[in-house]
Amino acid sequence: MIQKETNLVVADNSGAKKVRCIHVFGGTGRRYASLGDQVIVSVKAAVPGGVVKKKEVCKAVVVRCAKELRRKDGSYIRFDENAVVLLNAQGEPRGTRIFGPVARELRDRKYMKIVSLAPEVL
């Protein structure tokens, strides 16, 4: 479960390393985001010379979430960290590589580019 003020790891090579959630998309009263949900983040730590700079505000999609998620078949998926991939205005990833596994739920949410770049889909 991702909410406002949650610190997140960036799972792509856009230049950002750590970000903080400042808004969850999906209505006025929406409090939590889970796998495949979009959030607005503020960059807290970035690599020098990267595409993304510190203090920049951008959209992101949650690709790994520490809170377990129940699937239709009764199984649960859970990760060790909360991670996002930064998106551009068209909803495509800003980086050209994805680090670490991503959840299968992204395929259902039509993030095919992220799924194809990921080294492993769980």
From Swiss-Prot:
Keyword terms, alphabetized: Ribonucleoprotein, Ribosomal protein, RNA-binding, rRNA-binding
Keyword match Transferase: no
Superkingdom of origin organism: Bacteria
Functional description taken from the UniProt entry: Binds to 23S rRNA. Forms part of two intersubunit bridges in the 70S ribosome.
GO cellular component, one term: cytosolic large ribosomal subunit
PROSITE patterns per UniProt: RIBOSOMAL_L14 (PS00049)
The family this protein is said to belong to: Belongs to the universal ribosomal protein uL14 family.
Cross-referenced NCBIfam families: rplN_bact
One annotated GO molecular function: large ribosomal subunit rRNA binding
InterPro entries the record matches: Ribosomal_uL14 (IPR000218), Ribosomal_uL14_bac-type (IPR005745), Ribosomal_uL14_CS (IPR019972), Ribosomal_uL14_sf (IPR036853)
Positions of transmembrane segments: none
GO biological process assignments: translation
Protein name in UniProt: Large ribosomal subunit protein uL14
Subunit record text: Part of the 50S ribosomal subunit. Forms a cluster with proteins L3 and L19. In the 70S ribosome, L14 and L19 interact and together make contacts with the 16S rRNA in bridges B5 and B8.
Organism: Chlorobium phaeovibrioides (strain DSM 265 / 1930) (Prosthecochloris vibrioformis (strain DSM 265))
Record lineage: Bacteria, Pseudomonadati, Chlorobiota, Chlorobiia, Chlorobiales
